[in-house]
């Protein structure tokens, strides 16, 4: 596979995650999964270009992003569990009412 095929694949993943955020404003779990898909596509780009230029910095940076993404998803899921225990629903509209 050429680098263009890899770039098209990661661009497709990025667009899929972006459309998941834009089109689904009701379910916070799908929004969180779409954010993770965005981060995965960015990580794949870092790895592809690090292999292309034969440099390890892109792979190290990709591991750093994976660590931050894992922490972000763990914190997001913990907040959703607490919110569900308190209110019985994880609707975006109820979460937006908390900021008022």
From Swiss-Prot:
Family affiliation: Belongs to the complex I subunit 4L family.
A cellular-component GO term for this protein: mitochondrial membrane
Catalysed conversion reaction: a ubiquinone + NADH + 5 H(+)(in) = a ubiquinol + NAD(+) + 4 H(+)(out)
Disulfide bridge positions per record: none
Membrane topology, record value: Multi-pass membrane protein
Protein keywords: Electron transport, Membrane, Mitochondrion, NAD, Respiratory chain, Translocase, Transmembrane, Transmembrane helix, Transport, Ubiquinone
NCBIfam families xrefs: PRK05715.1-2, PRK05715.1-3, PRK05715.1-5
The keyword Translocase is assigned to this record: yes
Enzyme superclass (EC): translocase
Function: Core subunit of the mitochondrial membrane respiratory chain NADH dehydrogenase (Complex I) that is believed to belong to the minimal assembly required for catalysis. Complex I functions in the transfer of electrons from NADH to the respiratory chain. The immediate electron acceptor for the enzyme is believed to be ubiquinone.
Classification lineage: Eukaryota, Sar, Stramenopiles, Oomycota, Peronosporales
Locations listed in the record: Mitochondrion membrane
E.C. numbers: 7.1.1.2
Gene responsible for this protein: ND4L
InterPro entries the record matches: NADH_UbQ_OxRdtase_chain4L/K (IPR001133), NUOK/Mnh_C1-like (IPR039428)
Transmembrane region(s): 3-23, 28-48, 64-84
Entry protein name: NADH-ubiquinone oxidoreductase chain 4L
GO biological process, one term: ATP synthesis coupled electron transport
GO molecular function, one term: NADH dehydrogenase (ubiquinone) activity
Pfam families, per database record: Oxidored_q2
């Amino acid at each position: 596979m050429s680098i263009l095929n890899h770039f098209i694949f990661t661009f497709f993943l990025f667009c899929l995650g972006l459309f998941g955020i834009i089109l689904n404003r009701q379910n916070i779990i799908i929004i969180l999964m779409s954010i993770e898909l965005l981060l995965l596509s960015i990580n794949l780009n870092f790895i592809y270009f690090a292999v292309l230029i034969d440099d390890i910095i892109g792979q190290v940076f990709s591991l750093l992003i994976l660590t931050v993404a894992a922490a972000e998803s763990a914190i997001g899921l913990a907040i959703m569990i607490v919110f569900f225990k308190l209110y019985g629903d994880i609707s975006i509209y109820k979460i937006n009412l908390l900021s008022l």
